[in-house]
Amino acid sequence: QYLCGSWSFLDFELAVGPGVLCPRADTEVVAQAAAETLAGIAAPRVLDLCAGTGCLGLGVKRFCPAAQVTCVEKSPEAFVYLEKNARCALTGQGRQTENVLEPSALEQADVPAFDWGPSLNALRADRKPAYAVQPVQGDLFTYWETLPEGQLELIVSNPPYLTAAEMEQLQPEVAQEPAMALEAGEDGLVFYRALAQHYKNALCPGGALV
């Protein structure tokens, strides 16, 4: 995947490279199952945590074009791919213009400012991209503090889940991927505990955590 620079997910291509976890085929099933929880909701609000490439959030958006999706990723290296995929992955996949987040929507979010250098800053100011999903650089362990209660119909996440012992026995091809996207403490459950403890209040009545 890293050599190709892209990888198929559902019916679209995702940019991948060193520093981001390559999407797995079984994640497509998770995206579809998550999107099915949104049936009958006109404009569902969705949060994708530990987003990586954005595959889950973009997958939900693909199945449910009216969804308002925010994808949160901590790693600066992975965020580069998330932002690119948020801008490009669903292009030509039947999206309607009203389902694309214009720059003004992104600017209103709590997104860190990046210094791209004078020339690139000027270019970005003049030609800011539109996004299919809203990319935000943030940490699962603290991002919950920014969320109002009862506002989300769906939270999706494919967080790190390997134990410390499993990290020492990785297959060579998996060992090439970022440890930050794989390692989850001694028992592999540290991210799941944080999700269960801190994010349930952000869901509206009937909302789902997948």
Regions found by a protein language model. Give the residues of each.
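SAM-dependent Rossmann-like transferase core, predominantly class I methyltransferases
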Residues: 1-66, 71-82, 116
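Short, conserved catalytic or adaptor-binding loops enriched in Gly and charged residues
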Residues: 6-8, 123-128
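Exposed boundary/loop context
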Residues: 52, 109-110, 117-120
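Internal, well-ordered alpha/beta segment that forms a basic, Gly-enriched binding/recognition surface
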Residues: 103
